[in-house]
């Protein structure tokens, strides 16, 4: 159990993290929530604390993921135009962003492996942290290449499958954490493993199972659950359309501005 002094410091860090969130200073929000995680002394984080940690990291990583996608798109355009000098500059800049992405992912994955996953006691917290572990390995797989990409993909699959096993046995099909896991797991199949059939099957099964039990959904999680269900359906529509286009014309490539599958919402 945490000592009274540690508990007081913990409350202070949580308050500072909320202040940082309001000020949109997400790097500092991460620092405060890391201090909270290290102050709990084998206790679980509260639901509020784990959500703050998730939001902090999601914003910090999200900004870099967006930057990386923009720079990669520009790199492709400059390559197609034969602007080798520009391509060289862009690659150096992309490498800088990739270093930041790696550092952020390594930070949260270390926290998950050493503190958060081992301390998780309830079914929903186990799924929450294992899903988070899968997410950050997936973010690494988005930009790594060769063996590093393969390793990141394998770590993602292992974490998501472990989370899925617990979710299927301990969480209702309408539980927002279970739905969020299905959403992100299906995006992994589609984007990283290039398996649209498995992505669609997973998303459709999660959606159908949730629809069947929609009348049992409590008011407190109705908004979160139905929002993720909508994202699952949006992805299914997008992926089904893409698969039909591929059948019609296998050689046709996606336009640079093609719609991206929806990842989980920031909450």
Swiss-Prot record:
Keywords: Acetylation, Cytoplasm, Nucleus, Phosphoprotein. PROSITE patterns: 1433_1 (PS00796), 1433_2 (PS00797). SMART domains: 14_3_3. The modification Phosphoserine is found at residues 72, 195, 267. GO terms for cellular component: cytoplasm; nucleus. The keyword Lipid metabolism does not apply. Disruption phenotype: Disturbed levels of several metabolites (e.g. beta-alanine, aspartate, pyroglutamate, glutamate, glutamine, alpha-ketoglutarate, palmitate and shikimate). GO terms for biological process: regulation of metabolic process. It is found in: Nucleus; Cytoplasm. Gene3D superfamilies: 14-3-3 domain. Belongs to the 14-3-3 family. Interacts with TPK1. Interacts with the isocitrate dehydrogenase IDH3, and malate dehydrogenases MDH1 and MDH2. Interacts with DREB1A and DREB1B in the nucleus. Interacts with CINV1. This is 14-3-3-like protein GF14 chi. It comes from Arabidopsis thaliana (Mouse-ear cress). The lineage of its organism: Eukaryota, Viridiplantae, Streptophyta, Embryophyta, Tracheophyta.
């Amino acid at each position: 159990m945490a000592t009274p002094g540690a508990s007081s410091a913990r409350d202070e860090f949580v308050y500072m993290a909320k202040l940082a969130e309001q000020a949109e200073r997400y790097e500092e929000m991460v620092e405060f929530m890391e201090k909270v995680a290290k102050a709990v002394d084998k206790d679980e984080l509260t639901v509020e604390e784990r959500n703050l940690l998730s939001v902090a990291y999601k914003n910090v990583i999200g900004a870099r993921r967006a930057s990386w996608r923009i720079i990669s798109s520009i790199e492709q355009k400059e390559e197609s135009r034969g602007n080798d000098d520009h391509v060289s500059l862009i690659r150096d800049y992309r490498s800088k962003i990739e270093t930041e992405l790696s550092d952020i992912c390594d930070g949260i994955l270390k926290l998950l492996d050493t503190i958060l996953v081992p301390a998780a006691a309830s079914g929903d917290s186990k799924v929450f942290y294992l899903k988070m572990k899968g997410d950050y390995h997936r973010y690494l797989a988005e930009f790594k290449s060769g063996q590093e990409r393969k390793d990141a993909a394998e770590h993602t699959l292992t974490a998501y499958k472990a989370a899925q096993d617990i979710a299927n046995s301990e969480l209702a099909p309408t539980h927002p954490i279970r739905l969020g896991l299905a959403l992100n797991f299906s995006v992994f199949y589609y984007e990283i493993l290039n398996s649209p059939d498995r992505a669609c099957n997973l998303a459709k099964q999660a959606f159908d199972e949730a629809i069947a039990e929609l009348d049992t959904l409590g008011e407190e999680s109705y908004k979160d659950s139905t929002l993720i269900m909508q994202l699952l359906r949006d992805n299914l529509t997008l992926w089904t359309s893409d698969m039909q286009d591929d059948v019609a014309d296998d050689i046709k490539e996606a336009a640079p501005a093609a719609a991206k599958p929806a990842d989980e919402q920031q909450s």
